[in-house]
Amino acid sequence: MPDARPPCSILILAGGRGQRMGGRDKGLVDWRGEPLIAHVHRVVRPLSDDLVISCNRNQADYRAYADRLVGDAEADFPGPLAGVIAGLKVARHGWVVVLACDAPLVDRELIEGLLRLAVAGNSAAMVRQGGFWQPMFSVLPKRVLPALEQAWAAGERSLQKALLREAVQGLECAESDRRLSNFNSPERLQD
């Protein structure tokens, strides 16, 4: 059976300050013998010919994992909304999968489920876990870029709040779903 999945761009957000990691760049922190970004890259690379990483430092280290790198338009690590805006601006496809660099257990099944949901609803799709939205696991239609830019211009800095201003389909996942684990502290790397 042919693959009915529409072409998508992949946007991996790696532009954070890494405060809970003692200032270390989370995507480059080793877990099971390789950087966290390598684990995410291995899952998403077969899904797209357009892999974008939003990073504000260590570009030389991230280059091997991306087709293109982008940085935030503003200095001082303004947050994931800025990274999503920067990534949507350069994405080549109409659908963009958004993931965090510190989610090494994400799998193809989850990503494809989000993509199917987004396409079926012709709107954004985001994971909901235990009743909470998880914007770092989402698929966005590129056409939401102007709305996100408007939200930014109006002072919004929360990716979740900006996304929820538009129609969003929720992909329900169990609270215990390890695929959604974010390894954003040294303690989590011991899991």
UniProtKB/Swiss-Prot annotation:
One of its GO terms (cellular component) is cytoplasm. Transmembrane segments: none annotated. The N-terminal domain determines nucleotide recognition and specific binding, while the C-terminal domain determines the specific binding to the target protein. GO terms for biological process: bis(molybdopterin guanine dinucleotide)molybdenum biosynthetic process. PANTHER family: MOLYBDENUM COFACTOR GUANYLYLTRANSFERASE. It is an enzyme of class 2 (transferase). This is Molybdenum cofactor guanylyltransferase. GTP binds at residues 13-15, 26, 72, 102. The gene is mobA. Its cofactor is Mg(2+). Mg(2+) binds at residue 102. Its main location: cytoplasm. GO terms for molecular function: GTP binding; metal ion binding; molybdenum cofactor guanylyltransferase activity. It comes from the Bacteria. It holds the Pfam family NTP_transf_3. Keywords: Cytoplasm, GTP-binding, Magnesium, Metal-binding, Molybdenum cofactor biosynthesis, Nucleotide-binding, Transferase. Belongs to the MobA family. Transfers a GMP moiety from GTP to Mo-molybdopterin (Mo-MPT) cofactor (Moco or molybdenum cofactor) to form Mo-molybdopterin guanine dinucleotide (Mo-MGD) cofactor. It is found in: Cytoplasm. Monomer. Its EC number is 2.7.7.77.
